[in-house]
């Protein structure tokens, strides 16, 4: 095996791990929704969409056997993670500043009209308000955990893109 193949194999393992982490985070969100009765708000649902996109892109990239395809999908992962960072930061700012709203009246019908909300309503239907603060986990609010998750994913994928940028030339 040459260095090219070994590096691609390591990258594919990282992408599989990333995909499984997204599945675990989504499973945790469903646990909080159905066991702890913490209803998701529009921004929560948007964050779920970003985690789903990251997971799908990661699993597809893990199945690709050339660097160019992996690079394109990692770029899409980075874009989704950046969108997730922005959404989670907005959600966190709403929860830390009482009296602010996520615009439930305008956001809720848009989020609920997306096709996945019709196909999987238990996962993607809005049922709560963004300003509702649920008990923190280890002292961090739920949007804070999402922000940490998106930021770690973004840093890991951007570092990977930077580290392997020369492989695209070959």
UniProtKB/Swiss-Prot annotation:
The name of this protein is: Disulfide bond formation protein B
What's the domain of life for this entry?
A: Bacteria
- Cited HAMAP family: DsbB
> Which GO molecular-function terms appear in the entry?
electron transfer activity; protein-disulfide reductase activity
- Which InterPro entries is this protein grouped with? DiS_bond_form_DsbB/BdbC, Disulphide_bond_form_DsbB, DsbB, DsbB-like_sf
**Gene encoding this chain?**
dsbB
Species this chain originates from: Burkholderia cepacia (Pseudomonas cepacia)
Periplasmic compartment residues = 32-49, 90-144
Q: Does the keyword Cell inner membrane apply?
A: yes
Where are the bilayer-spanning segments?
15-31, 50-64, 72-89, 145-163
Annotated compartments: Cell inner membrane
Q: Which residues lie on this side of the membrane: Cytoplasmic?
A: 1-14, 65-71, 164-170
């Amino acid at each position: 095996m040459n260095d090219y193949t070994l590096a691609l194999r390591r990258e594919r393992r990282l992408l599989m791990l990333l995909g499984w982490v997204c599945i675990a985070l989504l499973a945790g969100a469903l646990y909080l929704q159905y066991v702890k009765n913490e209803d998701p708000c529009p921004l929560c649902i948007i964050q779920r969409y970003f985690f789903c996109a990251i997971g799908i892109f990661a699993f597809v990239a893990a199945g690709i056997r050339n660097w160019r395809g992996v690079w394109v999908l990692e770029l899409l992962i980075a874009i989704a993670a950046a969108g997730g960072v922005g959404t989670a930061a907005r959600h966190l700012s709403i929860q830390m500043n009482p009296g602010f709203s996520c615009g439930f009246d305008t956001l809720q019908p848009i989020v609920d009209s997306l096709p996945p909300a019709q196909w999987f309503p238990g996962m993607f239907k809005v049922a709560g308000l963004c300003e509702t603060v649920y008990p923190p986990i280890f002292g961090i609010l739920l949007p804070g955990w999402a922000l940490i998750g998106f930021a770690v994913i973004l840093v890991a994928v951007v570092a990977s893109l930077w580290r392997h940028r020369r492989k695209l030339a070959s």
